[in-house]
Amino acid sequence: MSGLIDTTEMYLRTILELEEEGVVPMRARIAERLDQSGPTVSQTVARMERDGLVTVAGDRHLELTDEGRRLATRVMRKHRLAECLLVDVIGLEWEQVHAEACRWEHVMSEAVERRVLELLRHPTESPYGNPIPGLEELGEKAEAESFLDDSMVSLADLDAGNEGKTVIVRRIGEPIQTDAQLMYTLRRAGVQPGSVVSVTESPGGVLVGSSGEAAELEAEVAAHVFVAKQ
């Protein structure tokens, strides 16, 4: 039974991730992000629909029900709080944190969540700069900001006028956090939330970095690195 619960929670979190980045939640997008077959995704989504967690709209995009959104928010909150704990207290390497938090998100109790918040002085963002949702459910006064706002743009969408200029890294999207080698490369190049980095177009996409170190990112990777102008 726990395997089914873990799978359901993983799907719920993935749908919320897609919504955050402004991507329409479709079964095909879930299959891409979770590297699962179409039939497997369809079967799981059908079960979630029967359980009242999602609905499938006429154009086949997925919508979370009130209960589905409540559960998805809790899973995402646990995931990002776990990431904070793993970095700030345990000292796990940045590139290893996401995968470990994917395990913790299914077992962390609300009591532990509250203790983590106290221990870490009430964080509102993950180590990757992503807002921790649903904090008000734990009695927190400060609500997390939206994932995207008008001040942010992905590296892939940076206009030509910003070519060769410096920007501030704001968020590292969930999809690329699964690639430990890529995350290591980003860390080495100083591409972390709060860092000021230079951006230059390259044959393979964009070249981004600071302090003499740089990482070349393909467009599909750059699409998940969100920055703001200085």
What residues fall within each predicted segment?
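Mid-protein regulatory/catalytic core that forms ligand/cofactor-binding pockets
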Residues: 106-219
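A short, conserved structural fragment
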Residues: 49-59
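Basic, amphipathic "hinge/linker" alpha-helix immediately C-terminal to the N-terminal HTH DNA-binding motif
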Residues: 60-79
